[in-house]
Amino acid sequence: MSVTGYDVRLRPAQPATPAADAFMIHHSDIGNGLELAYVREGVGGYPLLLIHGYPETKRIWWRNIEALVAAGFEVIVPDLRGHGDSDLSESDTYDLVTYSRDLYALVHDVLGHEHVGVIGGDVGGVVAVDMVHRFEGFVDALCFFDTVPPMVIDAYVAAGIDIGSIKAIADGPTGDYRRRQGGEPDVLAAELNSPALRRAWVAAMYGPRLWASPGTFSDADIDFMTEPWADEARLRAGWAVYQLGYGRAAEEFPILDRAVDVPTLLFYGADDQVVGPDFLHCCEVAFTNRVGPLVLAGAGHFLQWERADIFNPTVSMFFHSIASKV
């Protein structure tokens, strides 16, 4: 899509990235013998759950945590099972509903929150929508960006949206990763037979695969983001959601077939080449109580990192308005 005339060379400097060890990493058993790793800062504030996607870990939120804590929120930033510092699944169980149940167990059962605000993009956005519907009354409000929109197909057709145009579920010019990670993971894993090659595969998604706005991620940023993916088992865990479209079994289907009625702040990164601008039209239909979609120039798929200067204050204002009512 891009914003015509926007010069990314003039994009403001973004907040400094905290050191890799800037935040304490907690580990909690979520009741099934599996431990999730997470950052928890600002305890006592209104709770916000930040859910990463792929090829991400909790590190994608590093530029957001301090600002949201300073704004008065309790910020909970987990690694999904199999990702980052969280445990791998001994049963190789990785699917969207499992992620949803894991995070509910962490935030509700372990940390004791009866309700929460949720922020998610990519896989994290889909998990967030499932949580809205699956755990009624738990999610007060949502921030949703750059992911697969809810699949309210009849409503989209009625609104004149061409279902075939939804890029997030299509195979675009840089979309071979979907086929390879989903349909031939063993072949791909055999090719990526060293930590360096595995990191290079992920690094391309922060660079030449055009997920991000040009120049957003420095070499140091990419090193930081790819380090957790050097391990083959963790990279394979990240691929699991893509395999759901190629016959991988899931215990349950996520609840994505209905509109979202909770207050929702919507963003879209204008330079995203994974999720297309059809996302805007879909969100205007699927979210009945929305702010946005707000299109961010100079940002792509990882907009919380790429335009933290806009994301942090906007998210803070939105969730302050929610917290004042609950």
Residue ranges, per PLM feature:
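Flexible "cap/lid" subdomain of the alpha/beta-hydrolase fold that forms the substrate-access gate
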Residues: S2-D29, L36-V39, P47, I76, ...
